[in-house]
Amino acid sequence: MSDPRYQVDVSVVTHYLADQSQPEHERFAFAYTITVQNNGEQPARLMSRHWVITDGDGHVEEVRGAGVVGQQPLIGAGKSHTYSSGTVMTTKVGTMQGSYEMVADDGKHFDAIIKPFRLAVPGALH
């Protein structure tokens, strides 16, 4: 988004959860920690999320819901909000991407884009 009042950047760190996975049953658990950084001039509330989850076989699942981990945080200008969540896949590798619907203090609705990020069991990729 080019309007400096509404600039939100999203960064992601992922981890494979070996202790919660069951490879013999095609169950691979991943955690991700997301930081939503409000680089805009307006405080903004994260209202909802939209995820597109693609496994290593190309199967796509879409998830929509209010807020993140039960919250709709208000993120001040120059501030950030960090949270952790997770997902389970049936393949060793996959991707997630999506967007957050944001509402600025002035009432403007805009999307914060979550660029694709990889979920992978260590050693699964060459």
Swiss-Prot record:
Short name of one Pfam family: DUF525
Its source organism is: Pseudomonas fluorescens (strain Pf0-1)
Mind listing the GO biological process terms from this record? error-free translesion synthesis
Q: Which domain of life is it from?
A: Bacteria
Cross-referenced InterPro entries: ApaG_domain (IPR007474), ApaG_sf (IPR036767), Uncharacterised_ApaG (IPR023065)
The name of this protein is Protein ApaG
**NCBIfam families cross-referenced by the UniProt entry:** PRK05461.1 (NF003967)
Please report the stretch or stretches of sequence annotated as the ApaG domain.
Answer: 2-126
